[in-house]
């Protein structure tokens, strides 16, 4: 069985505080992208253990890979005694803040449910997703959403325009953990207004998005990797008004209704040596 694992971007990421457990509480606007990995998953004979492979050898495929963790969580939750062969065909860049690992885990949850014809509720699936990571619940349902808390509270939102996305991934990625550690040191210079941003998306007022979007982790990520600021400046110099780092970085995106502009400027940026992806928002 082959399932798609869709990337995401954050049009808003606001850090609201910390839980007693030390997790950062967030308020985010998350949008799924057409850009996706493909997950090839099949049942193995009982004598074998689950194993994960990937066509990108830089990806950790051992027990700490989120696909491996998803299998273990599904087996524990639903008393499954099967093993699986999982191969990841990677299109989503690693360490980019695009939710690739979370998307892979969510795809494995869906695939195991379908392969074994499990009669489980959406709530049960969500419980497994929450136990794996903050972005996995969003990736499981894969619809434009407001995500609150540590990612467990999802509210669907309306996006009433077609949006195209130009992504640039710097050569170096960033780990989410190191970014949050740095955030605790340097704070944020961003102030996204999630309520007003959601309203602008619903009403199709693209021109208002720059007034309300933002990412509280940008300052921390740029401190760790100044190239992120260079990429943002480059995209703005090419005429884009909605330019933001996604998640904890290191990827930066430009959002536009103008598909021709996205395609034209992507070619110009590729000529300058940037690692460029073109995709669009899924609704």
Give short role names for the model-derived ranges.
Residues 1-96, 114, 118-123, 148-150, ...:
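ATP-binding N-lobe of GHMP and related small-molecule kinases
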Residues 11, 39-41, 67, 101, ...:
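Residue-level signal for inorganic ion chemistry
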Residues 13, 37-41, 135-139, 145-146, ...:
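Short beta-strand scaffold segments in enzyme catalytic cores
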Residues 32, 130-131, 137-140, 156-161, ...:
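Solvent-exposed alpha-helices and their adjacent loops that cap or buttress functional pockets
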Residues 50, 141, 145-242, 257-270, ...:
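Conserved, helical-rich catalytic subdomain that frames metal- and/or nucleotide-binding sites
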Residues 76, 111-118, 188, 260-262:
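A glycine- and small-aliphatic-rich helix-loop capping segment at beta-alpha/alpha-beta transitions
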Residues 87-116, 134, 241-256:
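Glycine/serine-rich anion-binding loops at beta->alpha junctions
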Residues 105, 109-146:
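Contiguous, small/hydrophobic- and glycine-enriched helical/loop subdomains that border
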């Amino acid at each position: 069985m082959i399932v798609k694992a869709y990337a995401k971007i954050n049009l808003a990421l606001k850090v609201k505080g910390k839980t007693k457990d030390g997790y950062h509480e967030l308020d985010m606007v998350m949008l799924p992208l057409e850009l996706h990995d493909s997950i090839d998953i099949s049942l193995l004979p009982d004598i074998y253990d689950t194993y994960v492979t990937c066509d990108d050898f830089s990806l950790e495929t051992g027990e700490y890979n989120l696909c491996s963790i998803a299998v273990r969580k599904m087996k524990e939750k639903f008393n499954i005694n099967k093993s699986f062969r999982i191969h990841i065909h990677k299109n989503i860049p690693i360490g980019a803040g695009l939710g690739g690992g979370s998307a892979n885990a969510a795809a494995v949850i869906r695939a195991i449910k379908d392969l074994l014809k499990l009669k489980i509720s959406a709530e049960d699936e969500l419980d497994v997703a929450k136990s794996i990571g903050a972005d996995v619940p969003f990736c499981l349902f894969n619809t434009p959403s407001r995500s609150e808390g540590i990612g467990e509270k999802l509210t669907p939102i309306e996006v009433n325009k077609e949006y195209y996305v130009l992504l640039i991934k710097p050569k170096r990625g960033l780990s989410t953990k190191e970014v949050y550690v740095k955030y605790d040191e340097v704070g944020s210079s961003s102030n996204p207004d999630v309520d007003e941003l959601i309203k602008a998306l619903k009403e199709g007022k693209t021109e208002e998005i720059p007034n309300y979007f933002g990412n509280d982790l940008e300052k921390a990520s740029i401190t760790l990797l100044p190239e992120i600021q260079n990429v943002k400046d480059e995209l703005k110099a090419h005429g884009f008004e909605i330019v933001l780092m996604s998640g904890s970085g290191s990827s930066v995106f430009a959002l536009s209704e103008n598909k021709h502009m996205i395609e034209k400027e992507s070619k110009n940026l590729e000529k300058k040596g940037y690692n460029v992806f073109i995709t669009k928002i899924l609704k």
